[in-house]
Amino acid sequence: DETFAQTQPRLNMATFVTTYMDKYATQLMNEAIAINYIDETEYPRVAVMCAKCINIMANLWNSPEEGKWKTGALAIGSSEACMLGGVAAWLRWKERREAEGKPTDKPNFIISTGYQVVWEKFADLWQIEMRTVPLTLDKITLDPEAVIKLCDENTICVVPIQGVTWTGLNDDVEALDAALDAYNARTGHNIPIHVDAASGGFILPFINPDKKWDFRLKWVLSISTSGHKYGLVYPGLGWVVWKDKKYLPGKMSFSVNYLGADITQVGLNFSRPGAQVLGQYYQFIRLGFEGYRQVQHNSMEIARYLHSEIGKMAPFKNYSQDIVNPLFIWYMKEDYAKKAKWTLYDLQDKLKQSGWMVPAYTMPKDIEDSVVMRIVVRQGFSRDMADMLLGDIRAAITDFEKLEY
């Protein structure tokens, strides 16, 4: 009863998180809700399913690693997966510096100001300096040239993002890889790339498979993603995959024997739900590559439709001309905003009255004066629902323009 008046999950256009799975997947996860993944002795098949999921993602991202099993780890979400990728980069750097007899007290990593908050947590918790490259209205993704200017011998990694939370855009990992390759060759440093692909990791392989952003690139050593975003599984579930086992420091593996057998684990958390692993494995074998391609293609088509229609509305301008993920942002035209008696925050509140959650927010540092709105399209959001949302936006604008105060 207490949750009845809340926004219905499928009307929440703010979240990236999966809000729809078919009834069989839902039933499967409900029946597995008591499974603790870490109890591999009791649930050995769940561990095998997890390893198979890691193999599938590694292959999606063109892993060159040989052998039956690829190197990766399960996480509670993409935040833990990012942490694991970051810690691995830090430990590799630290071990190399110690072997060379050099100080290890001033590590740093580089990322754009469009980062997700987990990277701020990573910097604070591990006392690693976060160097940021500003996003601007002219440079709306990570600028490789600006990255190189921030690099030094203490840089543990650079973190490009595929599916920036603020904008929905992708950093150019291929250009960054080329810039880092030249820099590393010139300086003798070995600065790698960790790709934060929380959203894009499950979009690019199906929508733009020829684009090089993954393990095909020399300096990409690890990739993290979210299973509970475009991996199409209910929360919480994340994944991280390394290019090869040699890039996963041994210090990150912990063993216990008090669960009935020797169990080795890579992760910040110990207990974790097994139901999400079953959900991911179900989606992989139920949908297959073609099924995922169709789902993501449909989400992209609906997002493009909304992007086009909102761009035609008199008050608005889209942040980018095209979209590369099923999400986009827009802002109020400057000349319209000067005379308008309403703001995007008012539109957010108005749409909430109809059940929609379409967030309005300020952009990150250096362009924080810009207020935008964002729509995230996910599986379960239909063309009919898109038309309903557009109708409510148009009706809200009509009501606002009648205001006389």
Name each model feature, range by range.
Residues G67-W69, T104, S320-L327, E368-S370:
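Short Gly/Ser/Thr- and Asp/Glu-enriched loop/turn motifs at secondary-structure junctions
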Residues A73-K251, L259:
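Conserved PLP-enzyme active-site core in the AAT-like
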Residues V164, R286-F289, E334-Y336, V377-R383:
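A generic structural motif
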Residues Y183, K365-Y405:
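PLP-dependent enzyme catalytic core of the Aspartate aminotransferase-like
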Residues F206-N325, Y331-Y336:
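Active-site C-terminal subdomain of aminotransferase-like
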Residues D1-K70, G355-V358, M373, D392-I393:
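N-terminal entrance/gating region of PLP-dependent enzymes' catalytic architecture
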Residues Y336-L347, R383-M388:
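Short, conserved charged micro-motifs
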Residues L351-P359, R394-E401:
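A common structural junction motif
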